[in-house]
Amino acid sequence: MNTSNKIALLIRHADRDDIPEGSFGNDVLLNQMGQVNAFNYGEKLKNQQITKIYSSPVPRCVQTAEFIGKGYGRTIEIIETVALGAPGLHINDEKIAGKYYLEHGFDIMYESFKNGTIIPGMATLESLNQNMNDFIHKHTNENETTIFITHDMLIAFYHFSINKTVYTKENWVNYLSGITFKNGVNER
């Protein structure tokens, strides 16, 4: 009988202030509410076995991991990886995709992705799905919960690639929310 229990939480970083128009916002840190919410998120996970958090190297994601660790109350290794941001597995060429993003905006990028249109510098739906599935599977430990902290764009694109989940302004990826996988199966 297999009693394995691999849980992966792919979540957006905690609350931040608005990103200045015309920028990527990589320097925007968590605000006070984000720090408190990340700490509280960690407290709620105390009954789970967590030893690692994988994080985008963007500072607000690393901060989120640190505050989750403080709330959890035990040592958690934080591993920064560009697979989750700066640029992330949804981006093949940061300069080309960044230029497209600044010229056209996120809404056009997301619509194009959902329609299967090739976006300059971005991964295809199929390659994003395969690369993220492989990354999460490789880094999720048996009988543990592993946390992956990233950005709303990667979550929205990846979730669509899994099961055509569409995020809108009304149901956008909230801070500290995302996709849960149990034994490799998407539960949300």
Model-derived regions: residue spans:
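Acidic, low-complexity terminal tails and accessory targeting/binding regions
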Residues: 1-4, 84-98, 141-144, 156-188
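Active-site-proximal alpha-helix that buttresses catalytic centers in soluble enzyme cores
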Residues: 1-81, 118, 166-183
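Generic beta-sheet signal
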Residues: 6-9, 142-152
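Residues immediately flanking
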Residues: 14, 152, 158
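Phosphate-handling substructures
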Residues: 18, 23-24, 28-32, 68-131
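Short, active-site-adjacent cap segments at secondary-structure transitions
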Residues: 61-62, 154-156
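A short, acidic, amphipathic alpha-helical segment used as a generic capping/interface helix at domain edges
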Residues: 128-142
